[in-house]
């Protein structure tokens, strides 16, 4: 097995920290040493342990040495990866499996990252965010008016009557049961 310094060097050489999808890992086995790693590379490998093997070239005994001791995520660069890093019982973690699924769901949905993250913030599962998404609007009233237009309700009523619609009340009713909003992004509540 290589020395701790040699292990650090191998990991540092593989740590492609060039995107907004990076995580900072601290390894207790390596003396509390930390390094920024591209989370997309970790996801492509399948796990942090597999990344250490595939990207950093660690041998089985070296992997066992590192994996049998604590490690934690101490920071992230935001992006999508930030939604899958957190803290529990004082330790930082990275949920690689959920991050992998979310990357695929984001790509399939063809949504922009901020809208996708808004859906996740509302508690919508990553594989349902694209289906639940209704668009971006400046206000609940704008959303309600566009929804009624899309559903054909406005074309069915005389134009003079449209001026009497209380869009604030319509929006309030829609937002109570059927829809939810995060940072101007609107989603079905019943996904």
Predicted regions and their residues:
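Acidic interaction surfaces
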Residues: 1-191
